Curated annotation (Swiss-Prot):
Catalytic activity: beta-nicotinamide D-ribonucleotide + ATP + H(+) = diphosphate + NAD(+)
GO CC list: cytoplasm
Lineage: Archaea, Methanobacteriati, Methanobacteriota, Methanomada group, Methanococci
Domain of life: Archaea
Annotated EC: 2.7.7.1
Protein location: Cytoplasm
Single GO BP term: NAD biosynthetic process
Alphabetical UniProt keywords: ATP-binding, Cytoplasm, NAD, Nucleotide-binding, Nucleotidyltransferase, Pyridine nucleotide biosynthesis, Transferase
Descriptive protein name: Nicotinamide-nucleotide adenylyltransferase
Any GO molecular function: ATP binding
InterPro entries linked to this entry: Cyt_trans-like (IPR004821), NMN_Atrans_arc (IPR006418), Rossmann-like_a/b/a_fold (IPR014729)
Pathway assigned to this chain's UniProt record: Cofactor biosynthesis; NAD(+) biosynthesis; NAD(+) from nicotinamide D-ribonucleotide: step 1/1
């Protein structure tokens, strides 16, 4: 069985890795959708699809997991979004998602929809990790070592800090 899991992975963290490991025990192959692939260089989505692809592939090469990592673009037309995903991915029967809209869209198309159990959401949150990066707090322990290396390679911390700068002084 092949399943689909979509996320923004901004950045890919240990909670994401645990979810993928659990799903891989249930299915033969996982399609890891890199959602909102067109977004980057914002505080919410600082990393490009290619950078997120590196984070995922460099991490998962250390595990016996059969997967495809595929960029998925937002089309802002919910009624046809599932068809867009289908055109970009190998066939699959099951989707894992915590997003209620995505669950609804795939349910309406008769997919088996499962909600993955989040892993230690208190610590493993992309929002919290990006905030720690911005503040200069320790964040490296929250992501796989390979992700730390990718973020260092692309100078991701300084990118996030530059993105947070105001364009002018407020009076």
């Amino acid at each position: 069985m092949r399943a689909f899991l979509i996320g923004r992975w901004q950045p890919f963290h240990k909670g994401h890795l645990e979810i993928i490991k659990k799903i891989s025990a249930e299915v033969d192959e996982i399609i890891v959708g890199i959602g909102s692939c067109q977004k980057s260089h914002t505080l919410t989505d600082p990393f490009t699809a290619g950078e997120r692809m590196m984070m995922i592939t460099k991490t998962l090469e250390n595990y016996d997991i059969n997967y495809y990592a595929i960029p998925i673009i937002d089309i802002d037309y919910n009624a046809v979004w599932v068809s867009s995903v289908e055109s970009l991915t190998p066939p699959f029967t099951t989707i894992y998602t915590g997003n209620s809209l995505v669950r609804e869209l795939f349910s309406e198309r008769n997919y088996v929809v499962k909600k993955p159990e989040l892993y230690n959401r208190t610590d493993y949150s992309g929002t919290k990790i990006r905030k720690k990066m911005l503040e200069g707090s320790a964040w490296e322990h929250l992501v796989p070592e390979e992700v730390v290396k990718v973020i260092e390679e692309i100078d991701g911390i300084n990118r996030i800090r530059r993105l947070s700068e105001k364009d002018y002084d407020e009076e």
